[in-house]
Curated annotation (Swiss-Prot):
Domain FAD-binding PCMH-type: 1-176
EC number(s) recorded for this UniProt protein: 1.5.99.4
Gene that this polypeptide is encoded by: ndhM
Catalytic activity: (R)-nicotine + A + H2O = (R)-6-hydroxynicotine + AH2; (S)-nicotine + A + H2O = (S)-6-hydroxynicotine + AH2
Pathway(s) it belongs to: Alkaloid degradation; nicotine degradation; 6-hydroxypseudooxynicotine from nicotine (R-isomer route): step 1/2; Alkaloid degradation; nicotine degradation; 6-hydroxypseudooxynicotine from nicotine (S-isomer route): step 1/2
Cofactor: FAD
Cross-referenced PROSITE patterns: FAD_PCMH
Sequence intervals crossing the membrane: none
Protein activity control: Nicotine dehydrogenase activity is inhibited by tungsten.
Compartments, as annotated in UniProt: Cytoplasm
Name assigned to this protein: Nicotine 6-hydroxylase medium subunit
Applied biotechnology uses: Due to the increased usage of tobacco products, the industry generates solid and liquid tobacco wastes containing high concentrations of nicotine, which dissolves easily in water leading to the contamination of the ground water. Nicotine-degrading microbes can be used for bioremediation of these nicotine-polluted environments.
Cofactor note: Binds 1 FAD per subunit.
Job of this protein: Component of the nicotine 6-hydroxylase, which is involved in the degradation of nicotine. Catalyzes the hydroxylation of the pyridine ring at C6 to form 6-hydroxynicotine. Can use both L-nicotine and D-nicotine.
Organism: Paenarthrobacter nicotinovorans
């Protein structure tokens, strides 16, 4: 389908973008356009003004800052996947990014756009939650920081206010103790289930476990029932199995033409088990 007629704005600063966004509640930000343009073409969204961030300086940064990697919201998926800094400090992010669609999409789509879209099958929301990252947002009312645990509130829903723009994404360095798994019918398809795990070990005991699940559930979410089975225990195949069973049982699954809730339950349980084992092997 063709796009409808639209009004287009290309601000030269983040402040100008915030001003434009605040003056019209039906306006929308466009970054890479890989989420917004398809829904506009299907007439599922009809913004009064499309505000393009492409000419705002400083939004494509990717840099190491202390124990964090800092990303601008306009950094593309391809840039992240191919970044030496990401490969060194956030290898799980590089691994997850290779599952995103196809090269053409990865060359255009952006980190900030994916996080703001809040798709439960999206790789970046899952990674941000598992790695305990955070986003900085700005509006005409000022700036604030949103922790990953507070960002995703429902299907395609985030805690961003309608007039807020993501300006920075901060993710703590995590070179080890991680696992990522995703199942899709074909390479480049949306994942029917994806799981990310990070954990630490000290004196043979597991700690600081974060397990995030997407794709099979209505929103990106952590799995505290699985985390509780692991924290304070010794990692073993039996413990990984017990955690995966407890975690998978605690979730509510979507059911559609691509897979039943029962099918997705099985996928999630196996992916949790595998990613726990992978994370343990990388500690």
């Amino acid at each position: 389908m063709k796009l409808p007629a639209i009004r287009y704005a290309s601000p030269a600063s983040i402040e100008d973008a915030c001003d434009l966004l605040s003056t019209d509640e039906d306006s929308k930000i466009i970054a890479g356009g890989q989420s917004l343009l398809p829904v506009m073409a299907m007439r599922l969204a009809q913004p009064s003004v499309v505000i393009d961030l492409g000419n705002v300086p400083g939004l494509t940064r990717l840099e190491e800052v202390g124990d964090y990697v800092r990303f601008g919201p306009m950094v593309t998926h391809a840039t992240i996947v191919n970044s030496p800094a990401v490969a060194k400090h956030l290898p799980m992010m590089a691994a997850a990014g290779r599952h995103i669609a196809h090269p053409q999409i990865r060359n255009r789509g952006t980190l900030g756009g994916s996080l703001a879209h809040g798709d439960a099958a999206g790789e970046w929301p899952l990674v941000l939650l598992a790695l305990n990252g955070m986003v900085e947002v700005q509006s005409v009312r000022g700036r604030r920081t949103i922790e990953a645990d507070d960002l995703f509130v429902g299907p395609y829903m985030t805690s961003l206010a309608a007039d807020e723009i993501i300006t920075d994404v901060w993710i703590p360095s995590r070179p080890n103790g991680w696992g990522y798994g995703e199942f899709a019918r074909r390479s480049g398809d949306y994942g029917l289930a994806n799981v990310a795990v990070v954990l630490s070990t000290a004196d043979s005991r597991i700690s600081d476990v974060r397990i995030a699940v997407g794709g099979a559930v209505g929103k990106i979410q952590r799995v505290p029932d699985a985390e509780d089975v692991l924290n304070g225990s010794e990692l073993s195949p039996e413990r990984a199995e017990a955690a995966s069973e407890a975690g998978a049982k605690s979730l509510s699954y979507i059911s559609d033409i691509h897979g039943s809730a029962e099918y997705r339950h099985g996928l999630v349980q196996e992916l949790i088990r595998r990613t726990i084992v992978e994370a343990g092997a990388r500690t």
